[in-house]
Structure formats: C-alpha cells, structure tokens
Amino acid sequence: MGKRFSSFQAAQIRIARPTGQLDEIIRFYEEGLCLKRIGEFSQHNGYDGVMFGLPHADYHLEFTQYEGGSTAPVPHPDSLLVFYVPNAVELAAITSKLKHMGYQEVESENPYWSNGGVTIEDPDGWRIVFMNSKGISGK
C-alpha cells in the first residue's frame, strides 16, 4: 500500500488548504464533482474540516476552516487542480453540471489548458481544469 519514491515510501498523500466557506466548498467538491467524502471533523482545536478522495486512490484533498480565522488569499490563476478526463462526453457532463450550479468557465492563464480543457473556479477562486486527455503516466 502507498507509493514508493526514490528515497521513502508514503502511505498516503494529502493536499490540504484552508477556506473561509467550508459549506460551499463541500457543495462544489461533493455535489458538483461527486468526489467521495472520506473523512470529516469538527471543533478539533478550533478547526472543522473535510477530506475528499477518488475511489481506490492513495491521495486526497482536505479543506479546513478555522473558527475566527482569516480568509485565505486568492490563489494565482495558474495554481491548478487538474483532472484528466479521457471521455469527452463525461467532461461535457461534469462541466455542464458545474455551470448549472453557478460555476462558470474562466479563461486559463496558460493557453495550454484551453486546448482540450475547461477551467472552472471553485468557491475560493482555485481553478480546476478538466482536461480531455488520458494524462501522463511517467513510466
């Protein structure tokens, strides 16, 4: 289980970030992207949080909100979370669903992502790219 890197083995990889609007983030990632909620907590030393993952993956996203904490700064427009979606029909369906929920397509900072991809901002302004590609394997 886990991923073997050249100098260590990691059991899991978590990408964590703060938000000031946890309920909207949950709506976007759970209802909009249909990511599976794999964990959550509340009032843990003043923090509430939720974790989302892809089925059978050793990595997940965590979003936290601190009681009385400051709003996280808006990220650079080239700070991206990319989902490689090889099926064009599925890509159209997910982006259509998000647009119906009120999340509109935005122009990519890097024109590479506009060639076969759709970029949509989450409630905090972080950009999600749905790229019509099989991705890269690194093998």
Curated annotation (Swiss-Prot):
InterPro entries: Glyas_Bleomycin-R_OHBP_Dase, VOC. Residues 9-133 form the VOC domain. SUPFAM superfamilies: Glyoxalase/Bleomycin resistance protein/Dihydroxybiphenyl dioxygenase (SSF54593). Pfam families: YycE-like_C, YycE-like_N. This is Uncharacterized protein YycE. It comes from Bacillus subtilis (strain 168).
